[in-house]
């Protein structure tokens, strides 16, 4: 009987943590969606981008959502690959300072454009607009996370 008493406490605490995780994730995705909706409206207003894919709600979510997810994957993969190179070659001048950030930015922008963006024919954004958007993302990353370190590594 004692086993079931402790088991219920574990189940309740797990459900509480899971509920908080799901709610915070949903709020994050909602804010991300509103932010990207606002970005798309700004691009349309200034005639910098055109979004012509207009089916039902689920198809739009899958089409535009996959564009965002694949783009995030490219940014994430390049960032980790460049960090790996920087750790393997610490004395290389190409992987230190602002030149490292410039190489990361250029590689990410070119790979995003030629791997992801070209295949989405209903999203019409010029290369220079994508370059400015990704450049702003890198600038914000440098401002808000200047020298972030992995807190999980215990030395």
From Swiss-Prot:
Record key words, sorted: Cell membrane, Membrane, Transmembrane, Transmembrane helix, Transport
Function: Involved in multidrug efflux.
Record membrane topology: Multi-pass membrane protein
GO cellular component: plasma membrane
Organism of provenance: Staphylococcus haemolyticus (strain JCSC1435)
Location in the cell: Cell membrane
Upper lineage: Bacteria, Bacillati, Bacillota, Bacilli, Bacillales
Protein name according to UniProt: Multidrug resistance efflux pump SepA
Claim: Transmembrane helix is one of the keywords in the record: yes
Residues annotated as transmembrane: 17-37, 61-81, 103-123, 125-145
Family of this protein: Belongs to the multidrug resistance efflux pump SepA family.
Matches recorded under InterPro entries: SepA
């Amino acid at each position: 009987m004692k086993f079931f008493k402790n088991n219920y406490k574990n189940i309740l605490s797990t459900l509480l943590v899971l509920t908080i995780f799901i709610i915070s994730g949903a709020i994050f995705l909602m804010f991300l969606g509103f932010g990207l909706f606002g970005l798309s409206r700004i691009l349309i207003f200034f005639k910098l981008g055109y979004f012509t894919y207009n089916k039902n709600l689920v198809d739009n979510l899958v089409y535009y959502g996959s564009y965002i997810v694949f783009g995030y994957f490219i940014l994430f993969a390049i960032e980790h690959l460049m960090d790996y190179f920087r750790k393997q070659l610490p004395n290389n001048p190409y992987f230190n300072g602002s030149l490292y950030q410039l190489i990361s930015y250029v590689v990410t922008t070119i790979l995003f454009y030629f791997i992801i963006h070209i295949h989405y024919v209903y999203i019409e954004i010029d290369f220079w607009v994508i370059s400015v958007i990704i450049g702003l993302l890198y600038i914000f990353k440098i401002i808000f996370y200047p020298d972030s370190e992995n807190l999980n590594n215990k030395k």
